[in-house]
């Protein structure tokens, strides 16, 4: 699984997120660290992952629904393939729970 070119920086980032989330400062830390465009990209990636895990919609249709490129959908699909199946099952469960709340 590819994490980062610089694992030390990645681990520092993850640790900062853990600390911020544990202290209820998730909005502030993500706003500080991510530009509006990056936040939009993360939100789009989450939508892509959700639709890919649903498996009822073809990738081309996901691309059209989300008004994004085929390459963006492919990158999401390829990353899913690198993750442990147990983790992806957990992600799907979380997404399904979130969908019930909405």
UniProtKB/Swiss-Prot annotation:
GO molecular function: DNA-binding transcription factor activity; sequence-specific DNA binding
Swiss-Prot/TrEMBL GO biological process terms: negative regulation of DNA-templated transcription
Keywords: Cytoplasm, DNA-binding, Repressor, Transcription, Transcription regulation
Principal location class: cytoplasm
Listed Pfam families: Trp_repressor
HAMAP family reported in the protein's UniProt record: Trp_repressor (MF_00475)
Function: This protein is an aporepressor. When complexed with L-tryptophan it binds the operator region of the trp operon and prevents the initiation of transcription.
Protein name: Trp operon repressor homolog
């Amino acid at each position: 699984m590819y994490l980062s070119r610089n694992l030390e920086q990645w681990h520092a980032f993850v640790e900062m997120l853990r600390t911020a989330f544990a202290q209820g400062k998730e909005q502030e830390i993500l706003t500080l660290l991510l530009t509006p465009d990056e936040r939009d990209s993360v939100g789009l990636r989450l939508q892509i992952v959700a639709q890919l895990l649903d498996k009822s919609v073809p990738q081309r249709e996901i691309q059209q629904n989300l008004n994004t490129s085929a390459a963006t959908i492919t990158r999401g699909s390829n990353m899913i393939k690198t993750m442990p199946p147990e983790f992806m099952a957990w992600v799907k469960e979380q997404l399904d729970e979130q969908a019930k709340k909405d």
